[in-house]
């Protein structure tokens, strides 16, 4: 049962957007998916409450700041949305569970600096075991100097960039209805699905 953790110590970088869409991707493939939310804002849990009954099912994984309940038997894929400022024992407990960690990162010098020490922590866990780490650029305009700087920064870490996602209202409109890119006609979100291909391949391997 793969456990995919979405983590970044900085708030507002798109963790919940990634978590819900990763869960939506797994569900679209017919997997038994649970989505957990360790963030006090409970954005992912609120999103699940909006999800239509006719959409591919995604169950709630009960997670609190003090307790992570083991997913029930029959669950095949687990996604965990984490809070900003994830550190200490919570960081260690979450990393023990994780098979893969996705770090959303915006092309801003402030985001890059705020994330550096966290990525160093992750790299230490990666060396210690099975953990796979992937960086996803969020709200990226490939034509800008900022996106080039983001790639330069990630290159210095030796971590793979598994996706670069554009800034689009599609995520906002779909989230308001409890949906993901993988719940609607592909023709409506064709450009975004293209950007997800590399990330989906990484998730599956």
Question: What is the predicted function of each stretch?
Answer:
Residues 35, 80, 103, 135-137:
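Structural beta-sheet core signal
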Residues 141, 151-182:
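Beta-strand-loop-alpha "switch" segments that mediate conformational coupling across diverse proteins
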Residues 2-13, 20-96, 175-183:
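P-loop/Walker-type NTP enzyme "switch/lid" segment
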Residues 89-109:
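Inter-motif core of Ras-like GTPase G domains
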Residues 113-130, 138:
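Conserved C-terminal guanine-recognition region of P-loop GTPase G domains, centered on the G4
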Residues 181-205:
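NTP-binding/hydrolysis catalytic cores, primarily Walker-type P-loop NTPases
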Residues 32-33, 78, 132-133, 161-162:
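Hydrophobic anchor at the start of a short beta-strand
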């Amino acid at each position: 049962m793969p456990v995919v953790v979405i983590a970044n110590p900085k708030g507002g970088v798109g963790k919940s957007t990634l978590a819900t869409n990763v869960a939506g991707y797994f569900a679209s493939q017919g997997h038994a998916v649970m989505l957990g939310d360790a963030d006090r804002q409970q954005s992912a849990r609120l999103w699940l409450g909006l999800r239509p009954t006719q959409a591919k099912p995604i169950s709630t994984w009960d997670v609190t700041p003090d307790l992570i309940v083991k997913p029930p038997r029959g669950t095949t894929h687990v996604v965990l949305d984490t809070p900003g400022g994830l550190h200490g024992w919570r960081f260690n407990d979450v990393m023990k569970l994780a098979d893969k960690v996705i770090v959303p990162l915006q092309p801003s010098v402030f985001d890059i600096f705020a994330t550096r020490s966290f990525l160093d922590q992750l790299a230490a866990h990666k060396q210690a075991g099975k953990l796979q780490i992937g960086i996803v650029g969020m709200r990226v305009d490939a034509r800008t100097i900022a996106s080039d700087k983001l790639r330069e920064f990630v290159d210095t870490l030796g971590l793979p960039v598994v996706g670069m996602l554009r800034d689009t209202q599609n995520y906002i409109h779909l989230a308001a209805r409890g949906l993901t890119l993988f719940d609607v006609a592909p023709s409506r979100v064709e450009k975004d699905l293209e950007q997800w291909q590399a990330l989906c391949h990484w998730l599956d391997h």
